[in-house]
């Protein structure tokens, strides 16, 4: 039987050189699972707590030895010899109860999630099936449309661009493999476009370019130029997406949005006007966190104005939390949720959020964090849930490409049953 014999955690490094938690789960059958927990740069204030040591003499206070110790003592004592790795929901529930706090602040969401994911990997190993098939069953066959962050600003880059992410979505591709090729070709052409204009071509946290530009709108125009230079049609084969990360722009003192790169200050209503103008002018199909996470009136207004034709994704707004999402659904706020496993802390709660979104006609976009690793679990989650969309950076840097390569493998494994729905993945739009 696949009963857990050992749960072991260690401190490893993420893609930004910061410590994170790696967990290994061993079973009496010999089945084994390993996972590495991701970490965010711009975080919502309602996210589950990522436990950091705070010891400034180690890793500038970002060590995770407390979280590691919690896995190797409290969690290990609870799980070893008592649970089968096939009991994912039971184990996740036990971990939540063991922590006992609303935000997983006692043991740390990074400790709990590491165990939750490693257990799933061990179960798939025991059953000798791919992780996506174990998590989703025989009907897991939809490859996601990639939301590829090719130009970075905000908290993800040291430049004057206020908007955190500008992305391309190859909605007109015939397969995931084709979509990835389109994205990569646009990425390389963007480098050439930026170089021709005398802009920097260094990359940010998520692999996208991070130049200083004349305005936020110029980021859109250089990407459109790169799409055409690569031989594709903007608006037909390729749509644009933005993650504004507005909570990073919001000033609590005056209640306004400060776009420091442009030297502009906007009210909530002016931000909505701006998005309406941009989406009328350019082929933008998705906007994430267009307003501050606590500006629900602004989000509601944005949804009323453009929500029928533009995907409005809640990241900091919903933080992968079913209570937050339920409130959004009830109030008509947004039409999509960003799914980040470490915002909530267990696979069970992650899947509950995805199911709730789908039942309400909201899309669920599976997402990485800016601090990633070689762990590609989210690629399997995207296919397991037939989510239809994944956001995991540029086709650059191994920590991002690891997810894309895993999706290529999955598409190969699925063979003729694999589906890539492109624009049909946006079932939330009219």
UniProtKB/Swiss-Prot annotation:
An annotated Gene Ontology molecular function: phosphopyruvate hydratase activity
Active site: 206 (proton donor), 340 (proton acceptor)
InterPro entries (UniProt xref): Enolase, Enolase-like_C_sf, Enolase-like_N, Enolase_C, Enolase_CS, Enolase_N
Record's GO cellular component terms: cell surface; extracellular region; phosphopyruvate hydratase complex
PROSITE patterns, A to Z: ENOLASE (PS00164)
SUPFAM superfamilies, sorted: Enolase C-terminal domain-like, Enolase N-terminal domain-like
Matches recorded under NCBIfam families: eno
Alphabetical list of SMART domains matching this protein: Enolase_C, Enolase_N
Family: Belongs to the enolase family.
EC number: 4.2.1.11
Pathway the protein takes part in: Carbohydrate degradation; glycolysis; pyruvate from D-glyceraldehyde 3-phosphate: step 4/5
Cofactor note: Binds a second Mg(2+) ion via substrate during catalysis.
Cofactor(s) named in the record: Mg(2+)
Source organism of the structure: Lysinibacillus sphaericus (strain C3-41)
Keywords: Cytoplasm, Glycolysis, Lyase, Magnesium, Metal-binding, Secreted
Gene3D superfamilies assigned: Enolase-like C-terminal domain, Enolase-like, N-terminal domain
Chemical reaction(s) catalysed: (2R)-2-phosphoglycerate = phosphoenolpyruvate + H2O
Annotated function: Catalyzes the reversible conversion of 2-phosphoglycerate (2-PG) into phosphoenolpyruvate (PEP). It is essential for the degradation of carbohydrates via glycolysis.
This protein's name: Enolase
GO biological process, one term: glycolytic process
Gene name per UniProt: eno
UniProt-annotated binding residues for Mg(2+): 243, 288, 315
Residues holding (2R)-2-phosphoglycerate: 164, 340, 369-370, 391
Domain of life: Bacteria
Main location: cytoplasm
Localization: Cytoplasm; Secreted; Cell surface
């Amino acid at each position: 039987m696949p009963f857990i014999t050992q749960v072991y955690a260690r401190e490893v490094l993420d893609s930004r050189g910061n410590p994170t938690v790696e967990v290994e789960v061993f079973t009496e059958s010999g089945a084994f699972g390993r996972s590495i927990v991701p970490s965010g740069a711009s975080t919502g204030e309602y996210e589950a707590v990522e436990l950091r040591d705070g010891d400034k003499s180690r890793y500038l206070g970002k060590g995770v030895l407390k979280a590691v110790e919690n896995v190797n003592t409290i969690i290990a004592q609870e799980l070893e010899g008592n649970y089968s790795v096939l009991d994912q929901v039971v184990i996740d529930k036990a971990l939540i109860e063991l922590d006992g706090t609303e935000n997983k602040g006692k043991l740390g969401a990074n400790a709990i999630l590491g165990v939750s994911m490693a257990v799933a990997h061990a179960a798939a190993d025991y059953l000798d099936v791919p992780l996506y098939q174990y998590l989703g069953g025989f009907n897991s066959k939809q490859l996601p449309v990639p939301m590829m962050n090719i130009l970075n600003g905000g908290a993800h880059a040291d430049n004057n661009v206020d908007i955190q992410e500008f992305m391309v979505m190859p909605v007109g591709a015939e397969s995931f493999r084709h979509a990835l090729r389109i994205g990569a070709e646009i990425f390389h052409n963007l480098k050439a476009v930026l170089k021709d204009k005398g802009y920097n071509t260094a990359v940010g946290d998520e692999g996208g370019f991070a130049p200083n530009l004349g305005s936020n709108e110029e980021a859109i125009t250089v990407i459109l130029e790169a799409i055409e230079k690569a031989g594709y049609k903007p608006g037909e084969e390729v749509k644009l997406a933005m993650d504004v990360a507005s909570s990073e722009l919001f000033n609590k003192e005056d209640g306004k949005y400060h776009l420091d790169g442009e030297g502009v200050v906007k009210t909530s209503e002016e931000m909505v006007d701006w998005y309406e103008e941009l989406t009328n002018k350019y082929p933008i199909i998705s906007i994430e966190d267009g307003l501050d996470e606590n500006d629900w009136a602004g989000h509601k207004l944005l949804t009323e104005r453009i929500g029928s034709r533009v995907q409005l994704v809640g990241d900091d707004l919903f933080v992968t939390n079913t209570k937050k999402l339920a409130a959004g659904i009830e109030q008509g706020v947004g039409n999509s949720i960003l799914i980040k496993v470490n915002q909530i802390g267990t696979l069970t709660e992650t899947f509950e959020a995805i199911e709730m979104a789908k039942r309400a006609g909201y899309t669920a976009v599976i997402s990485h964090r800016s601090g990633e690793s070689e762990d590609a679990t989210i690629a399997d989650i995207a296919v397991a849930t037939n989510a239809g969309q994944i956001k995991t950076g540029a086709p650059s840097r191994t920590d991002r490409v690891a997810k894309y390569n895993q999706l290529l493998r999955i598409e190969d494994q699925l063979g003729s049953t694999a589906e890539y729905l492109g624009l049909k993945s946006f079932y939330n739009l009219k």
